[in-house]
Amino acid sequence: MNDAVLELVDLKRSFRQGDVTIDVLRGVNASLRRGEIVALLGPSGSGKSTMLQAVGLLEGGFGGTIRIDGEDVTRFQQGERTKTRREKIGFVYQFHHLLPDFNAIENVVLPQLIRGAGQAEAEDRAADLLARLGLSERLHHKPSKLSGGEQQRVAVARALANRPLLVLADEPTGNLDEATADRVFDQFVALVRDHGSAALVATHNERLAARMDCVLRLHEGRIEA
């Protein structure tokens, strides 16, 4: 049985800048299994964000193959890509991107409603996730009334609200102090593992990367051996 959630085969991406072609991804090969937390480590400009955009089906124009849950999503039309993104992928960013006029629980309920969950079910799910992240007393606070660490924990709950197979995180603790970052990351890892998801975490932080199951070092568009 193949338990790979994500498989990348010869993933490539180039951009034109005037008369010059810039190769950002140069044949990336990788795979993630259920329950696995993998660091995508590299400096700024190494192609980390471009790779997450490809895997997250946020952009087209990539060469190679991306398989999510065994399906070659590079062959999908836009409607199928959107459906896969909503049903199978969760996103966590460095900056939380919470809706400012919605409180914590509403921010976690909304993606579930978009996917078709009932209101009561979505609220129960959101309250449970936020409680596990230590936010039981902050459910009805808007983002402006939450600390940076609390905001990021709401973002983690939102990413996991629809029980995604794959979580993509782009510098998820990069805007937090070290102690807060460690707490948020520990909670993130625990939830991902409990859900049986896989997570690909882009970071330039060697210390954070060392705490994950595996490290993919991206340098000039290639995974280093």
UniProtKB/Swiss-Prot annotation:
Residues 6-225 form the ABC transporter domain. Its main location: membrane. The keyword Secreted does not apply. It is found in: Cell inner membrane. PROSITE patterns: ABC_TRANSPORTER_1, ABC_TRANSPORTER_2, LOLD. InterPro entries: AAA+_ATPase, ABC_transporter-like_ATP-bd, ABC_transporter-like_CS, ABC_transpr_LolD-like, MacB-like_ATP-bd, P-loop_NTPase. One of its GO terms (biological process) is lipoprotein localization to outer membrane. Keywords: ATP-binding, Cell inner membrane, Cell membrane, Membrane, Nucleotide-binding, Translocase, Transport. One of its GO terms (cellular component) is plasma membrane. It is a peripheral membrane protein. Its EC number is 7.6.2.-. Belongs to the ABC transporter superfamily. Lipoprotein translocase (TC 3.A.1.125) family. The complex is composed of two ATP-binding proteins (LolD) and two transmembrane proteins (LolC and LolE). This is Lipoprotein-releasing system ATP-binding protein LolD. It comes from Sphingopyxis alaskensis (strain DSM 13593 / LMG 18877 / RB2256) (Sphingomonas alaskensis).
